[in-house]
Every structure is written in C-alpha cells, then in structure tokens.
Amino acid sequence: MPRIRGIPGPYRFFFTSFDCGEPPHVHVEREDKTCKFWLEPLGLVRSHGFDAHELNRIRRLLRVHLTAILETWYEHCDKR
C-alpha cells in the first residue's frame, strides 16, 4: 500500500495496488474518518466523517502536492 509522504498535517494519504485499475486517486484517513479524491481532475468521490471545512483543507493540500502524488501513483502503477 503506497503511502504518500511529505504532506504535513494529521492525515494519511495512500492508495493500494488494487487501485491501479482505476483513474488516479488517493484515499485520506484521519482517526475513523476517510475520504477518496480523484486526482485528474481533482474532485471528491466520497467521504465518511469529514466535515466540509476539513474536506476543503484536504483539497488544498492535494492541490499543493498534486504533482508529487501523481508521480508516486504513476511510478507505482506503471510498474505493475
């Protein structure tokens, strides 16, 4: 399960090898909350437990780190 490192804050950003058959996306967790964002274009797929304010914060973090996240995605998924 590739984890995206270097993004500040209390969140865990990751995807799984099983995700490589889908368009690029990332899962985000914090405590018992989870959400999934498509990366191209950036958009929320689903959320469980995060409020709108926190989802906006996550979206901003994704925008700032989008290039690094996509590089990690393609590096992992293109090797499969």
Regions found by a protein language model. Name each.
Residues M1-Y11:
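Negatively charged, low-complexity tracts enriched in Asp/Glu with abundant Ser/Thr
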Residues P2-I4, V45, N56-I58:
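Short, intrinsically disordered low-complexity segments
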Residues G9-Y11, K33-C35, L66:
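Generic structural motif recognizing short loop/turn segments at the entrances and edges of beta-strands
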Residues F14-A52:
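A short, structured beta-strand/loop element
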Residues D51-R80:
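C-terminal structural segments of small proteins and small subunits
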